[in-house]
Amino acid sequence: LALLFLVLSAGSGFTQGVRNHVTCRINRGFCVPIRCPGRTRQIGTCFGPRIKCCRSW
């Protein structure tokens, strides 16, 4: 049970912590001003809510 909690809490913190372009790049993401293209998903923002940080699956 403790291991499950550790895994779930680590995963949720990863996706919520990306708020600038440096953190985006560290998490192997890239910044785009539109929707995340193709087989990528949004993991945060880069320069405010309009610029998305995207990462491939």
Curated annotation (Swiss-Prot):
InterPro entries: Beta/alpha-defensin_C, Defensin_beta-like
Keyword Electron transport: no
GO molecular function: CCR6 chemokine receptor binding; chemoattractant activity
Major subcellular site: secreted
Cellular localization per UniProt: Secreted
Domain of life of the native organism: Eukaryota
Disulfide pattern: C24-C53, C31-C46, C36-C54
Pfam families linked to this entry: Defensin_beta
GO cellular component, one term: extracellular space
Keyword presence, Disulfide bond: yes
Family assignment from sequence similarity: Belongs to the beta-defensin family.
Its biological purpose: Has bactericidal activity. Active against E.coli ML35 and S.aureus 502A.
Annotated protein name in UniProt: Beta-defensin 3
Gene name linked to the record: DEFB3
